[in-house]
């Protein structure tokens, strides 16, 4: 599936809800499995439905715009309800309603209007705790900004522009080609004015007539709690500036989390290990252990077995988008068996072995302690 739901529907990120609905209906009728029997049409139909499911609802669309797929991964993508499209008959009505008139009646003699700026990508590294708790980060981004000298016109202050003589201000040129099948007209962007319809008399010295300049900007962005490797954040209108009055593009920040020496992460749960003595395992105890929230008390039950996993509830990773919900901290318990003991310890252990009816002559101390752990 396409990595971007907007691309799946073929719409701009600023598209209205009606634009999204129209694009969805157009593509859905094209790839509907009862209409399109080509291989892959059904899979394409499911992709289109999933994209519409996310983008048609303001809440899920907002989460997707900010976090990408991670923000909507919980939304149900299984199955498809044909009723979402207003009924199968409605699809056919839409299909055949477009064949009543001519094709290509719109005018092609129009200059290129405002153009949206390009989107930009920035990769940002976070340490383990920054990803869990979020916070503010300062970043520097090189991008194109509107030239402040000419206000984006590209013309030297005090001068202007004239109508392009090549396209007569249309921004496009038409070329007729004759073939054995008739004449065909090919329309392309004017090479002299690049579709603007106007030619600058004297270019701005600051930007060289481009209307934009490369600048490096400092930004403070908010990292939400619970982000993970690959989480994508959208910072609106911080991409490249548009041209001819177009809106700026967006900045997409992709997050990469540095590993931690003590903790690992699995979804919303945090994992760590502790090592205790065989006596602590047999008798039980209370210990202070490190968590992402600081030191916490952990109860080791008497008779704890090697590789037992103990849990501290609500000390894991906050849920992305709802930090009131947290995962757990899971602690794997390792038990240290001593390789050397003093005479007093040996005497006590031999007494214990006698009480338990265990022979300590075979298998050594470790074998004896192992039998204790698995009684």
UniProtKB/Swiss-Prot annotation:
GO MF annotation: an example: ATP binding
Function: Participates actively in the response to hyperosmotic and heat shock by preventing the aggregation of stress-denatured proteins and by disaggregating proteins, also in an autonomous, DnaK-independent fashion. Unfolded proteins bind initially to DnaJ; upon interaction with the DnaJ-bound protein, DnaK hydrolyzes its bound ATP, resulting in the formation of a stable complex. GrpE releases ADP from DnaK; ATP binding to DnaK triggers the release of the substrate protein, thus completing the reaction cycle.
Record: residues binding Zn(2+) 1: 147, 150, 204, 207
Listed SMART domains: DnaJ
Keyword Zinc-finger appears in the UniProt entry: yes
Binding-site list for Zn(2+) 2: 164, 167, 190, 193
Ranges where the J domain occurs: 4-68
Known partners and oligomeric status: Homodimer.
Zinc finger (CR-type): 134-216
Family: Belongs to the DnaJ family.
Lipid biosynthesis keyword on record: no
Name of the protein this chain belongs to: Chaperone protein DnaJ
CXXCXGXG motif repeats: 147-154, 164-171, 190-197, 204-211
Record-linked PANTHER family: CHAPERONE PROTEIN DNAJ A6, CHLOROPLASTIC, DNAJ HOMOLOG 1, MITOCHONDRIAL-RELATED
Domains as described in the record: The J domain is necessary and sufficient to stimulate DnaK ATPase activity. Zinc center 1 plays an important role in the autonomous, DnaK-independent chaperone activity of DnaJ. Zinc center 2 is essential for interaction with DnaK and for DnaJ activity.
Required cofactor names: Zn(2+)
Keyword tags: Chaperone, Cytoplasm, DNA replication, Metal-binding, Repeat, Stress response, Zinc, Zinc-finger
Example GO biological process: DNA replication
SUPFAM superfamilies reported in the protein's UniProt record: Chaperone J-domain, DnaJ/Hsp40 cysteine-rich domain, HSP40/DnaJ peptide-binding domain
Organism: Rippkaea orientalis (strain PCC 8801 / RF-1) (Cyanothece sp. (strain PCC 8801))
InterPro entries from the UniProt entry: DnaJ, DnaJ_C, DnaJ_domain, HSP40/DnaJ_pept-bd, HSP_DnaJ_Cys-rich_dom, HSP_DnaJ_Cys-rich_dom_sf, J_dom_sf
Manner of cofactor binding, per the entry note: Binds 2 Zn(2+) ions per monomer.
């Amino acid at each position: 599936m396409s990595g971007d739901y907007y691309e799946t529907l073929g719409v701009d990120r600023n598209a209205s809800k009606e634009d999204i609905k129209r694009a969805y209906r157009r593509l859905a009728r094209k790839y509907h499995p009862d209409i399109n029997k080509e291989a892959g049409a059904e899979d394409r139909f499911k992709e289109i439905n999933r994209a519409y499911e996310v983008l048609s609802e303001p809440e899920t669309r907002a989460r997707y715009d900010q976090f990408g797929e991670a923000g909507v991964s919980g939304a149900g993508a299984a199955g498809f309800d044909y009723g979402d499209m207003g009924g199968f008959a409605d699809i056919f009505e839409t299909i055949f309603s477009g064949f009543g008139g001519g094709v290509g009646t719109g005018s092609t003699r129009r200059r290129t209007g405002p153009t949206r700026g390009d989107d930009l990508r920035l990769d940002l590294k976070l340490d383990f705790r920054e990803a869990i708790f979020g916070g503010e980060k300062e970043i520097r981004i090189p991008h194109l900004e509107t030239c402040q000298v000419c206000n984006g016109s590209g013309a030297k202050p005090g001068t202007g522009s004239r109508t392009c003589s090549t396209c007569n201000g249309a921004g496009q040129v038409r070329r007729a080609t004759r073939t054995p099948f008739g004449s065909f007209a090919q329309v392309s962007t004017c090479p002299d004015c690049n579709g603007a319809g106007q030619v600058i008399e004297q270019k701005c010295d600051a930007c060289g007539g481009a209307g934009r300049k490369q600048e490096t900007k400092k930004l403070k962005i908010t990292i939400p709690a619970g982000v993970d490797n690959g989480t994508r954040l959208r910072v609106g209108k911080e991409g490249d500036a548009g041209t001819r009055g177009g809106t700026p593009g967006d900045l997409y920040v992709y997050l990469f989390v540095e590993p931690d020496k003590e903790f690992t992460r699995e979804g919303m749960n945090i994992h760590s290990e502790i090592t205790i003595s065989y006596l602590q395992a047999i008798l039980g105890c209370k210990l202070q252990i490190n968590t992402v929230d600081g030191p916490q008390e952990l109860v080791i039950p008497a008779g704890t077995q090697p590789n037992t996993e103990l849990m501290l509830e609500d000390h894991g990773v906050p849920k992305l988008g709802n930090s009131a919900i947290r995962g757990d901290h899971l602690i794997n318990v390792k038990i240290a068996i001593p390789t050397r003991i003093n005479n007093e310890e040996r005497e006590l252990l031999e007494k214990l072995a006698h009480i338990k009816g265990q022979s300590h002559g075979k298998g050594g101390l470790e074998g004896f302690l192992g039998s204790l752990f698995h009684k």
